């Protein structure tokens, strides 16, 4: 199916969709803007530049024990952290169950003792932590852009409270 036909079909349904072009998979949210990209031959490689930039947190926290992420998308960042940081416990909040449902297509790991996806609002999710997170990664978008609940002063205060003493937060 052509990308245009897929977009028009999904736009009517209002759901995220996956487009395959050869060995590349991309995630879209009812428009032609790529939200995530994965090469099937190298599924753990961070294909988009912004994801490599966000991993700059390793300069400040080279061995994080606890990482909380808001926004799953195609799972590039959580998957990379899971594979490359074997001593890290990773929790991901994704508000959209239709995005979570695509996890197998993007080869995102199953939940286990050190990796878990929570289908909930990231702003509510982050309230569960207190001075415990070494890294908070915020990459939460909806069809219109940044999710409104992730743009409030209260959200940023909750993130600050959730960080460990040496913790860092990165925001796309």
Which role does the model predict for each range below?
Residues 1-64, 83:
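Rossmann-like AdoMet
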Residues 9, 45-46, 51-168:
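The AdoMet/dcAdoMet-binding core of the Class I SAM-like
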